């Protein structure tokens, strides 16, 4: 069973012109709107997207969404944004009012499947005493973070001073008896990051798990990263 993203329904991005095409009159080339599809356990199964430019109007391209995450040149031109800012840009470029999200979804015509697999078992098979389930997720992101953005995350998440060498920032949340911890790490030497989230569930409120994953993903989007996929390891 597939479900839409548990957080804010759609993600918005601004696409900047190529460096050799930029002028004082054109600061934004277009807008991209995306939505992940997910299994009931919140792992990613696919991505829907639509793009808009003043010249072409609305169109859909899975290749564009892939390029936003894999093409180094494209990565420099894509900026995560809010719906409010996307509305302002859409209006400034002559598109008038940005359509409602229900209407935007009608432009999702080129679905990109994302391969999934049964959860890999990392860490202990049994949860600690007092919890009925242990889950581990990894959210992968493209683009890079500046030092001040990492510092902002450490402050927001109250990362202990020093921390661990493997993690750039960490956080913890206790909610109605459930415990969530997370670690932000750089992936290799490329422009990529991952957020590892461990959930120890005492209740049956899996909706809290979905909202926590979604909010953490959105926090990193607001800091400039582009989500790629959500995998489950336990």
Residue locations for each model-derived region?
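Short, flexible, solvent-exposed loop/turn segments with mixed acidic/basic and small polar residues
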Residues: 66-68, 123-131, 182-190
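Ordered, small/hydrophobic-rich secondary-structure cores
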Residues: 1-80
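Surface-exposed beta-loop interaction hotspot
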Residues: 83-167
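Short glycine-aromatic motifs
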Residues: 75-82, 90, 95, 225-227
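Short acidic, S/G/P-rich loop/turn micro-motifs used as interaction or catalytic elements
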Residues: 21, 144-147, 200-207
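Long, hydrophilic "mature protein body" segments
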Residues: 15-18, 56, 82-83, 89, ...
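Short, hydrophobic/proline-enriched secondary-structure or compact coil segments at domain edges
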Residues: 11-17, 137-139, 193-200
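Extended, charged low-complexity segments
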Residues: 174-234
